[in-house]
Amino acid sequence: MLSCRLQCALAALSIVLALGGVTCAPSDPRLRQFLQKSLAAAAGKQELAKYFLAELLSEPNQTENDALEPEDLSQAAEQDEMRLELQRSANSNPAMAPRERKAGCKNFFWKTFTSC
């Protein structure tokens, strides 16, 4: 009987201490500022990581060019020039509208060819 009372008293005491510890938790403004700074730093690191990833993706050939020999560099430069010329020619001469096509042309419509 004595041990039952002792166990109940210890259980009640532990519950009171647990509730008291939770309600008396320090609400230190320095702790709150530290947590806010750490969250801001984590967000800043994510933005920094996104920036570096975008920078790496914007120039994927740079690391390849560093490892190439001078002959390969000239070949890569020629390929880049050809790519730029193709882009310029595609932009400067857009596809002709259907009304501007020549008189004898044929269009592929559905499964048959039709004349303009």
Swiss-Prot record:
Residues 25-88 form a propeptide. Residues 62-99 are annotated as: Disordered. GO terms for cellular component: cytosol; extracellular space; GABA-ergic synapse. The modification Alanine amide is found at A43. GO terms for molecular function: hormone activity. Belongs to the somatostatin family. This is Somatostatin. It comes from Canis lupus familiaris. The lineage of its organism: Eukaryota, Metazoa, Chordata, Craniata, Vertebrata. The gene is SST.
